[in-house]
């Protein structure tokens, strides 16, 4: 049995299908959020990953925006700031596909499903390393939940080896070429990007526009790369 992490497929159902075909039946994938928006099959991918027993679906900032837009529509009967935020981030079609679900009770079921997604998860791997999984990553010692979904300011933070030597943080959220970190030149090389003395790793390959996705083995830290055909 292998345990993997993947993130930020953003509507790329084709890449999900490749990953699914690669997996053995007993494998598990922690999906670190942002299944929808921007890509061609966003709502379908959200439903598919949520319903897939091999995938542990964590919340991303796009799921959070979608839930807030759903709430505005169902409870206040209007498309407000939350909806506009979602649309500005590529979520117009995702929202419309959800809104076209027959019956308000079914719409509410999906709102509750996504609202209840976990924001952080810990996996202790075979080498007894604590692998902390969240959408955006963070620095140990920060406890604000918003960091787990939205943080983009932790890339050059110092790492306290004395207290956190046995921790690895796996995240997505910011496509690797867009990370504000020394040594990056804005070009994408498929795979995982390790930094912070190899205690943090970003696996967001910008799937929507690069056509790449990374599956990271959480025990061996081997990388498996998938690309559009």
Where are these regions (language model features)?
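His/acidic metal-ligating clusters that form di-metal
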Residues: 103-181
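Active-site neighborhood of phospho(di)ester-bond hydrolases with catalytic His/Asp-centered motifs
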Residues: 6-7, 29-33, 57-61, 134, ...
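Active-site environment of divalent metal-dependent phosphoester hydrolases
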Residues: 10-14, 37-40, 64-67, 140-141, ...
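A conserved acidic, glycine/proline-rich C-terminal tail/linker
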Residues: 176-206
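Active-site neighborhood of divalent metal-dependent phosphoester bond hydrolases
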Residues: 42-121, 128-129, 157-158
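Conserved hydrophobic/aromatic beta-strand scaffold that supports enzyme active sites
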Residues: 26, 117-120, 133, 171, ...
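Binuclear metal-dependent phosphoesterase catalytic core
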Residues: 196-229
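N-terminal active-site segment of His-dependent metallophosphoesterases
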Residues: 1-48
């Amino acid at each position: 049995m292998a345990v993997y992490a993947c993130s930020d497929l953003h509507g790329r159902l084709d890449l999900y299908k490749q990953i699914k075909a690669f997996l053995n039946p007993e494998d598990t994938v922690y999906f670190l959020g942002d299944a929808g928006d921007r890509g061609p099959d966003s709502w379908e991918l959200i439903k598919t990953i949520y319903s897939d027993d091999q995938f542990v679906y964590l919340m991303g900032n796009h799921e959070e925006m979608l839930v807030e837009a759903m709430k505005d529509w169902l409870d206040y009967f209007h498309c407000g700031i939350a909806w506009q935020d979602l649309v500005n981030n590529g979520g117009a079609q995702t929202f419309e596909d959800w809104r076209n679900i027959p019956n308000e009770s079914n719409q509410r079921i999906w709102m509750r499903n996504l609202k209840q997604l976990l924001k952080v998860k810990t996996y202790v791997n075979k080498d007894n390393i604590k692998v902390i999984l969240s959408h955006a990553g963070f620095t140990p010692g920060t406890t604000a939940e918003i960091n787990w979904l939205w943080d983009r300011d932790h890339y050059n933070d110092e790492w306290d080896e004395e207290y956190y030597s046995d921790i690895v943080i796996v995240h997505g959220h910011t496509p690797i070429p867009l990370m504000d970190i020394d040594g990056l030149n804005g070009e994408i090389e498929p795979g995982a990007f390790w930094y912070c003395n190899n205690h943090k790793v970003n696996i967001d390959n910008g799937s929507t526009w690069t056509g790449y996705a990374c599956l990271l083995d959480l025990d061996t830290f081997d990388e498996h790369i998938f690309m559009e055909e």
